[in-house]
Amino acid sequence: AANAVWNYSLVEGQRAFLVFNPLFDNYYGYDVGIKPERIYPFLTKSVEELTDENEEEFADHPAYLENMWIAGGYLNVIFNQKLPTTHKHRVSLVKKAGEPDIADDGYIHLEYRYNTYGDTLDVFNPSVGVVCYNLNTLPLEEAKGIKLKINEAYYGERILSFENMNEPTPDDAKELHSIARLEVE
């Protein structure tokens, strides 16, 4: 049977949303055999180092964050953004240079950064985006969890705590099959 997944190349470590139809139970030793229908690759990035020299590049503009959770060694973020008019926007997960991997409180301290590159957010026609950050460079097993500093458009600056490093996928994240392709890097 044909499927709609054509001209897609797998990329090691890239996260994606797969829409499929189950075909068979207990298929050659697997739980189920499937027919892929669509695949939506997500922007997949690593944790970056924040220094005095590159702080302006990461910026810290308010972001429209919808949901965040950690699973499979990734911090997964669902966000809304205005479609860029001139430059791709930049979303980043950063760790301050020179700080220990695990702080005195037992947590890994990170920051979510957003750079609009001067685009205004006054005319807001939101589009949903997803970014997944690979956390494999961090000592997750040795830490109590992650404390994440965010700058939300609705609530301002906050710190979120994540103790569960393998959360179930939120229900709203299971409905991303209509996601638009955003211009972010």
Regions found by a protein language model. Give the residues of each.
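Flexible glycine-rich surface loops and low-complexity tracts that mediate binding to linear polymers
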Residues: 7-33
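Short, solvent-exposed, Trp/other aromatic-anchored flexible loops in extracytoplasmic proteins
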Residues: 9-14, 115-146, 153
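Short beta-strand elements
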Residues: 154-184
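N-terminal post-signal-peptidase region of extra-cytosolic proteins
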Residues: 2-6
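Surface-exposed beta-loop interaction hotspot
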Residues: 26-80
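Short helix-loop boundary/capping segments
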Residues: 63-119
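Short acidic/polar inter-strand loop motif in beta-rich domains
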Residues: 21-30, 140, 150-160
